């Protein structure tokens, strides 16, 4: 049984910590800062960091990789088509890799960056570590990719089993939900989610992980084929958007300025 906890970093990052109590081995996802991981290891001296999983090359996701590799000798996994510090295993779409006894499938999900990958573990309760591609009620900015690429990447993730747990890497949920409410003010599920997320953050509690089912009902970037979302995008752009990709592009540009 793998336990998953979040180690906060910077202002709003989460470094996901996977723990196998049987072997006393652990793994981390996107350690942008080594210090939170080093502190956890110091508090748990009988545990060993065996793997470091990286989704993309941005500094707030890889800044701690080299130091942790030097400290622990952990294996570093990352996208083949990006420059990842101290990488041991370069991963491409469709490959499978075993971490702490779990087999993860690699998805290439370009958009936020061109080489971005996600790690998916199919199980009774599937796990998805998706970096800055899919957020709770949102998606990543398009620093390198196109709207069409990101739309395709999100559609791929949206097709995963509804109970898939979504481990993204930023506490952006409330700001994303405010935008989602601007897009769909009459979405009852969205209003309920906003109220719940507000209660959690007022108690300084994490709003993650999410689930694919929740994203399908409340994330505007996964709802670009819904009439209510298309109508709002048409109003925003002043023209008829004929494809889901066009609707997505309007929403992403709007969110960038929201």
From Swiss-Prot:
Return the protein name. Hydroxyacylglutathione hydrolase
As for family, the record states: Belongs to the metallo-beta-lactamase superfamily. Glyoxalase II family.
Which EC numbers does the record give? 3.1.2.6
- Please verify whether the record's keywords include Nucleotide-binding: no
Residues reported to bind Zn(2+) 2: 60-61, 132, 170
What the entry lists under Pfam families is as follows: HAGH_C, Lactamase_B
Role this protein plays: Thiolesterase that catalyzes the hydrolysis of S-D-lactoyl-glutathione to form glutathione and D-lactic acid.
What GO terms are given for molecular function? hydroxyacylglutathione hydrolase activity; metal ion binding
Q: Note the subunit structure.
A: Monomer.
Q: Which organism is it from?
A: Pseudomonas aeruginosa (strain LESB58)
Name the residues that bind Zn(2+) 1. Answer: 56, 58, 112, 132
One Gene Ontology term of the biological-process aspect is: methylglyoxal catabolic process to D-lactate via S-lactoyl-glutathione
Pathway membership: Secondary metabolite metabolism; methylglyoxal degradation; (R)-lactate from methylglyoxal: step 2/2
Reactions this protein catalyses? an S-(2-hydroxyacyl)glutathione + H2O = a 2-hydroxy carboxylate + glutathione + H(+)
The cofactor note from the UniProt entry for this protein is: Binds 2 Zn(2+) ions per subunit.
Cofactor dependence is on: Zn(2+)
């Amino acid at each position: 049984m793998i336990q998953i906890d979040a180690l906060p970093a910077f202002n709003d990052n989460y470094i996901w910590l996977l723990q196998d109590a049987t072997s006393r081995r652990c793994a981390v996802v996107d350690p942008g800062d080594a210090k939170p991981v080093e502190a956890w290891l110091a508090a748990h001296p009988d545990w060993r960091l065996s793997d470091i999983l990286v989704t993309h090359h941005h500094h707030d996701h890889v800044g701690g990789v080299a130091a942790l590799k030097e400290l622990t000798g952990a294996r570093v996994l990352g996208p083949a088509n990006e420059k990842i510090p101290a990488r041991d295993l370069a991963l491409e779409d469709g490959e499978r890799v075993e971490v702490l006894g779990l087999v993860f499938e690699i998805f290439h999900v370009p958009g936020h960056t061109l080489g971005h990958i996600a790690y998916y573990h199919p199980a009774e309760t599937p796990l998805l570590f998706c970096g800055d591609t899919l957020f709770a009620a949102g998606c990543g900015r398009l620093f390198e990719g196109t709207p069409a690429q990101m739309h395709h990447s999100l559609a791929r993730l949206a097709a995963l089993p509804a109970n898939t747990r979504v481990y993204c890497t930023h506490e952006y949920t409330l700001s994303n939900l405010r935008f989602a409410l601007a897009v769909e003010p009459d979405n009852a599920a969205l209003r309920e989610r906003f109220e719940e997320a507000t209660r959690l953050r007022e108690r300084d509690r994490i709003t993650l992980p999410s689930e694919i089912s929740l994203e399908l009902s409340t994330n505007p970037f996964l709802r670009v084929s819904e009439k209510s979302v298309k109508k709002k995008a048409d109003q925003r752009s002043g023209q008829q958007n004929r494809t889901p990709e066009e609707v997505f592009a309007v929403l992403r540009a709007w969110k960038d300025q929201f």
